[in-house]
Amino acid sequence: MSTLFVSDVHLSEKNPKLTDLFFYFLKNKAILSRSLYILGDLFETWVGDDNITYISKELANITNYLADNGTSCYFIKGNRDFLIGKSYFKSSKITLLPYKKIININKQSIIILHGDTLCLNDKNYQKFKKLVNQDWLQKFFLKLPLCARIKISNLIINKRKKLNLKRMNYLTKINKEYIKKIMEQTNTNIMIHGHIHMPKVHVLPNRKYRIVLGMWNKSGSILEINKKLSLIKFSKLYCSYTSYPLKY
């Protein structure tokens, strides 16, 4: 059985076709796998576990079904859904992982993360991330009325879209020396991350790989690991594979 990885799905009530595609993937592809790792930004935004929507309810129903039928689901928080709380993970039978996690698959030592922490060139974002991850600020925000949290979230989303149009090239400049340092310190030979929306398998020296997951839109972006690495462009009608052999 294979292990699957996705990130940057950005589920939103405003994009029902995307939601339908992701749920189709869970029911028809993920159900056949051993494990599914979701590496952040599953949701376009998350303002609290009390904001119950069709998407959050149906996703929990599906992941419960997966867990009950042998597919384990794991989650690393991204920069859009870092406020998902314990109650939702419990109700959905999804296991929360730390921001960086080392796993082993087929004798491969792999480090997984969302990927925003690799964008060291974006100093303003790193300051923002440090601020919003403070426990006191998150508790304060979650105590606000739900309508206020939704309004604040929408303002942030609109501002983020404008900033990203101007700064996308700058934001996607991953610090390669930092990546090398992380992989050496953790003694891993594969790194998997999302965030920058540029799917690719980067072949590194010494039989190492850095795999970037893509963003979901009209099609899905999936990494599958079994006896090889495969980046999959997924839709209901077709799947295209770009595969690389695993080196032992």
Curated annotation (Swiss-Prot):
Pathway involvement of the protein, from the record: Glycolipid biosynthesis; lipid IV(A) biosynthesis; lipid IV(A) from (3R)-3-hydroxytetradecanoyl-[acyl-carrier-protein] and UDP-N-acetyl-alpha-D-glucosamine: step 4/6
Transmembrane stretches, start-end: none
Membrane-protein topology: Peripheral membrane protein
Enzyme Commission number(s) of this protein: 3.6.1.54
CC terms in the record's Gene Ontology section: cytoplasm; extrinsic component of plasma membrane
Disulphide bridges: none
Subcellular location: Cell inner membrane
Keyword Glycoprotein: no
Record-listed substrate binding positions: N79, R80, D122, N164, R167, H195
Binding-site positions, Mn(2+) 2: D41, N79, H114, H195
Keyword Transmembrane helix applies: no
Keywords: Cell inner membrane, Cell membrane, Hydrolase, Lipid A biosynthesis, Lipid biosynthesis, Lipid metabolism, Manganese, Membrane, Metal-binding
Cofactor annotation: Mn(2+)
Listed InterPro entries: Calcineurin-like_PHP_ApaH, LpxH-like, Metallo-depent_PP-like, UDP-diacylglucosamine_Hdrlase
Cofactor note: Binds 2 Mn(2+) ions per subunit in a binuclear metal center.
Reaction it catalyzes: UDP-2-N,3-O-bis[(3R)-3-hydroxytetradecanoyl]-alpha-D-glucosamine + H2O = 2-N,3-O-bis[(3R)-3-hydroxytetradecanoyl]-alpha-D-glucosaminyl 1-phosphate + UMP + 2 H(+)
GO BP terms in the entry: lipid A biosynthetic process
GO MF annotation list: manganese ion binding; UDP-2,3-diacylglucosamine hydrolase activity
Gene3D superfamilies linked to this entry: 3.60.21.10
One Pfam family cited in the UniProt record for this chain: Metallophos
Residue sites binding Mn(2+) 1 per the record: D8, H10, D41, H197
Similarity section: Belongs to the LpxH family.
Main function: Hydrolyzes the pyrophosphate bond of UDP-2,3-diacylglucosamine to yield 2,3-diacylglucosamine 1-phosphate (lipid X) and UMP by catalyzing the attack of water at the alpha-P atom. Involved in the biosynthesis of lipid A, a phosphorylated glycolipid that anchors the lipopolysaccharide to the outer membrane of the cell.
Name this protein carries in UniProt: UDP-2,3-diacylglucosamine hydrolase
